[in-house]
């Protein structure tokens, strides 16, 4: 860590910015983590795409089907790659935020302490999956307060539909007062995240993984962080970086130019969206990666791989998307 616990909020306001992507995990034929393939993906994301940061070992990465040592290994390789790349010719080091979410609090703390020890920049933990509805707000607040007490590293909240509930902006704002809470990935509707931005946008980063709305959120809400999903490396190539481009233009106040670039990506978005089978985002993302020349591969159970028909539909959509490969 390059900051003290008391400095976490200030540090994140300056450094937890830009376009961040959530990794997919390549497995070999025996469904073990393919470390060579993953390192090559990391090099592409960090050096070719020059992403602001990477979100490691989350849902897209299939953390739920990994052992604790495997999750730690993903984190270690990611931190090593970011550190080895350095400041990338002056644009700054690629940040690393590790997803330490689990239903077991001891596992969450073990992964978060490991992240802190190996040099990750931040950790993110999704709100607990609750099986009973009584005193939900107090339960969630105490969960994050306990994590904040136990950790020095910057901590991001994460609330999504899989948790079974939506945290209210008021609850999120209360948690945002904790000393090392620095951000929230708020996978909810715009009314909620707009309200939360109005409440605490000067204290923590508020973000949402919908890439289509990212430009509007920069312009209208003053957002500085896309946190995050797979679009930064599925919608972009080494020679076609329109998401990065419209982000830079918008940050520079060139909103009309940014809008033109943003809108030009719609055929790619549509191809990616329309060819994605319901319930198979990881398998589809990996198939798209393979078409891009990245390392995708298979998914682990309980997830299902694409059928041959779904693969063919994905190939056709990819070929018609207009995404430039060279």
What are these model-derived regions, one by one?
Residues 31, 45, 78, 115, ...:
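Conserved, mostly hydrophobic/aromatic
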Residues 2-9, 18-25, 44-51, 222-223, ...:
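C-terminal alpha-helical cap/extension of soluble enzyme domains
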Residues 2-164, 302-305, 324:
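Active-site beta->alpha loop and helix N-cap motifs at the rims of alpha/beta catalytic domains
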Residues 66-67, 109, 135-138, 168-169, ...:
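Short secondary-structure transition/capping segments
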Residues 38, 75, 108, 193, ...:
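A general structural signal for well-ordered alpha-helical segments in protein cores
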Residues 146-149, 161-269, 273-277:
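Catalytic alpha/beta core domains of metabolic enzymes, predominantly
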């Amino acid at each position: 860590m390059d900051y003290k616990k008391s400095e976490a909020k200030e540090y994140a306001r300056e450094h937890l910015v830009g376009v961040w992507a959530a990794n997919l995990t390549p497995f070999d034929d025996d469904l073990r983590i393919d470390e060579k393939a993953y390192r090559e993906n990391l090099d592409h994301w960090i050096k070719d795409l020059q992403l602001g940061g990477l979100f490691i070992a989350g849902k897209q990465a299939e953390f739920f089907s990994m052992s604790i040592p495997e999750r730690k290994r993903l984190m270690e390789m990611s931190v090593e790659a970011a550190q080895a790349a350095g400041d990338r010719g002056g644009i700054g080091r690629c940040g690393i935020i590790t997803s330490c979410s689990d239903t077991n609090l001891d596992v969450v703390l073990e992964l978060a302490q490991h992240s802190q020890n190996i040099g990750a920049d931040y950790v993110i933990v999704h709100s607990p999956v609750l099986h009973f509805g009584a005193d939900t707000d107090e339960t969630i607040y105490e969960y994050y307060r306990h994590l904040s007490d136990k950790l020095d590293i910057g901590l991001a909240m994460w609330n999504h539909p899989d948790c079974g509930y939506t945290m209210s902006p008021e609850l999120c704002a209360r948690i945002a007062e904790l000393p090392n809470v620095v951000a929230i990935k708020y996978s909810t509707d715009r009314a909620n995240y707009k309200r939360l931005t109005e409440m605490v946008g000067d204290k923590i980063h508020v973000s949402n993984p919908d890439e289509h709305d990212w430009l509007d959120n920069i312009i209208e809400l003053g957002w500085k962080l896309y946190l995050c999903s797979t679009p930064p490396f599925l919608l972009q190539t080494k020679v076609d970086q329109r998401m990065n481009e419209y982000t830079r233009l918008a940050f520079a106040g060139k909103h009309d130019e940014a809008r033109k670039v943003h809108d030009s990506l719609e055929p790619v978005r549509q191809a990616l969206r329309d060819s994605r089978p319901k319930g198979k985002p990881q398998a589809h993302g990996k198939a798209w990666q393979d078409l891009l020349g990245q390392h995708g591969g298979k998914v682990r159970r309980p997830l299902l791989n694409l059928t041959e028909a779904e693969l063919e539909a994905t190939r056709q959509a990819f070929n018609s998307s207009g995404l430039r490969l060279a």
